[in-house]
Swiss-Prot record:
The modification Phosphoserine is found at S93, S191. One of its GO terms (molecular function) is RNA polymerase II cis-regulatory region sequence-specific DNA binding. Residues 294-357 form the bZIP domain. This is Cyclic AMP-responsive element-binding protein 3-like protein 2. Binds DNA as a dimer. Changing R427A: Loss of S1P cleavage. There is a cross-link at K178 (Glycyl lysine isopeptide (Lys-Gly) (interchain with G-Cter in SUMO2)).
Length: 521
């Protein structure tokens, strides 16, 4: 954007929030309801592509470098190109792009004739979108309000106007323009045959602060326009349109109209921009070099405003999308956190239940092991007892102390004893001399001896304290060479010896005696 002119430099100050502060209803109350496409019927399809050959946008001829006439006043150029300041309520106006590569044709200049009117009535153009979607190649809706204001024209009149006998003062229009951003790419790479004129929608101009631009040329007390369309409502007002909207837009004059000779008809946007910048409005063709330069400059500024507003709109949309993503991510994060908390609580409860089950299982296993060990020990003890009983019955005939008994036998039963008496029912071996024959005639003595034996047996039982056992009839053998008295004494002594021995180990002696008897027979 060109911001320097006549050695003066200024700072661009864009009021980007004006379009977001106003209400759409207030602006619509000030506008007519004539559709924007109805004003474009005067353009034919052959004129749609003529904007690409505009010499005032791309051609840098040597004639442009010539200084303007000294008789013409110095243009009042401001740094800000926001042209929305006026004492009357302002609305949005449409505008468009023009191609940067144009060519100037002298034949078209001579063939075309155009008229110029010095007074322009107040007009308002309003376009409403039909759908909310904006496919690629679309531009936003625009509303244009043009207000006729009487301003002195003598200081801004060019030499061409003076030679043509223009009036000293006339009414000039100061249109106000408001934009809302839309895609810059929608204004480029288009074909006139791709869309019709009925689908035309123009983007609004960016928010502006006109005080910096027209501070020297307009009112000394500028005030901001209180009405502007909200940017939030712009996407809803978007309407599909063809790429031929730029070539048919009234914001820029068609290139073929700037050629030839005759009256010059400029668009309201161009006139408003020229007045806001302090340039005189050309009325006749051909244009002077200064007029061509000024017209080229204001057309370039219109393009720059479009690109700036589009960049802001894209940024706004991008930020809105990011905010929506952040909100969705935040809600999803909260939901996931809640789910994680629920899962953690469930995990804790499951762990507690698992620990309880483990303790129960370990207790049961330990009890089972203890019971199994106890049962095993009991079984082993029973088996050992069974073996002990079995082997005890098998070795009952040998006794627990066979060697000790055998060693004690010689002392218990000396060889000098003629015979041994037993207290149990058994057989006793009587020792006698074979060379002494037995006398069978001594039966009475035998009877007396048997009586003595019986008395000895009863005495033995009484002294030993044993249970009463049936008396055993022992045969008595009489040696022929001994007397009855000697026999009785021997029997008593033997009985006394046996009773004294049995007092120490009664059971052992009885078993031993029985064993000896059994072994003998």
């Amino acid at each position: 954007m060109e911001v320097l002119e006549s050695g003066e430099q200024s700072v661009l100050q864009w009021d980007r929030k004006l379009s977001e502060l106003s209400e759409p209803g207030e602006t619509e109350a000030l506008m007519y309801h004539t559709h924007f496409s109805e004003l474009l019927d005067e353009f034919s399809q052959n004129v749609l592509g003529q904007l690409l050959s505009d010499p005032f946008l791309s051609e840098k001829s040597e004639s442009m470098e010539v200084e303007p006439s000294p008789t013409s006043p110095a243009p009042l150029i401001q740094a800000e190109h926001s042209y929305s300041l006026s004492e009357e309520p302002r609305t949005q106006s449409p505008f468009t792009h023009a191609a940067t590569s144009d060519s100037f044709n002298d034949e078209e200049v001579e063939s075309e004739k155009w008229y110029l009117s010095t007074e322009f009535p107040s007009a308002t153009i309003k376009t409403e979108p039909i759908t909310e979607e904006q496919p690629p190649g679309l531009v936003p809706s625009v509303t244009l309000t043009i207000t006729a204001i009487s301003t002195p024209f003598e200081k801004e009149e060019s030499p061409l106007d003076m030679n043509a006998g223009g009036d000293s003062s006339c009414q000039t229009l100061i249109p106000k323009i408001k934009l809302e951003p839309h895609e810059v790419d929608q204004f480029l790479n288009f074909s006139p045959k791709e869309a019709s004129v009925d689908q035309l929608h123009l983007p609004p101009t960016p928010p502006s602060s006109h005080s910096s631009d027209s501070e020297g040329s307009l009112s000394p007390n500028p005030r901001l326009h209180p009405f502007s369309l909200s940017q939030a409502h712009s996407p809803a007002r978007a309407m599909p349109r063809g790429p031929s909207a730029l070539s048919t837009s009234p914001l820029l004059t068609a290139p073929h109209k700037l050629q030839g000779s005759g009256p010059l008809v400029l668009t309201e946007e161009e006139k408003r921009t020229l007045v806001a910048e302090g340039y005189p409005i050309p009325t006749k063709l051909p244009l002077t070099k200064s007029e061509e330069k000024a017209l080229k400059k204001i057309r370039r500024k219109i393009k720059n405003k479009i690109s700036a507003q589009e960049s802001r709109r894209k940024k706004k949309e991008y930020m809105d999308s990011l905010e929506k993503k952040v909100e969705s991510c935040s809600t999803e994060n909260l939901e996931l956190r809640k789910k994680v908390e629920v899962l953690e609580n469930t995990n804790r409860t499951l762990l507690q239940q698992l620990q309880k089950l483990q303790t129960l299982v370990m207790g049961k296993v330990s009890r089972t092991c203890k019971l199994a060990g106890t049962q095993t020990g009991t079984c082993l003890m029973v088996v050992v007892l069974c073996f002990a009983v079995a082997f005890g019955s098998f070795f009952q005939g040998y006794g627990p102390y066979p060697s000790a008994t055998k060693m004690a036998l010689p002392s218990q039963h000396p060889l000098s004893e003629p015979y041994t008496a037993s207290v149990v029912r058994s057989r006793n071996l009587l020792i006698y001399e074979e060379h002494a024959p037995l006398e069978e005639s001594s039966s009475p003595a035998s009877a007396g001896e048997l009586g003595g034996w019986d008395r000895g047996s009863s005495l033995l039982r009484a002294s030993s304290g044993l249970e009463a056992l049936p008396e055993v009839d022992l045969p008595h053998f009489l040696i022929s060479n001994e007397t009855s008295l000697e026999k009785s004494v021997l029997l008593e002594l033997q009985q006394h010896l046996v009773s004294s021995k049995l007092e120490g180990n009664e059971t052992l002696k009885v078993v031993e005696l029985e064993r000896r008897v059994n072994a003998t027979f």
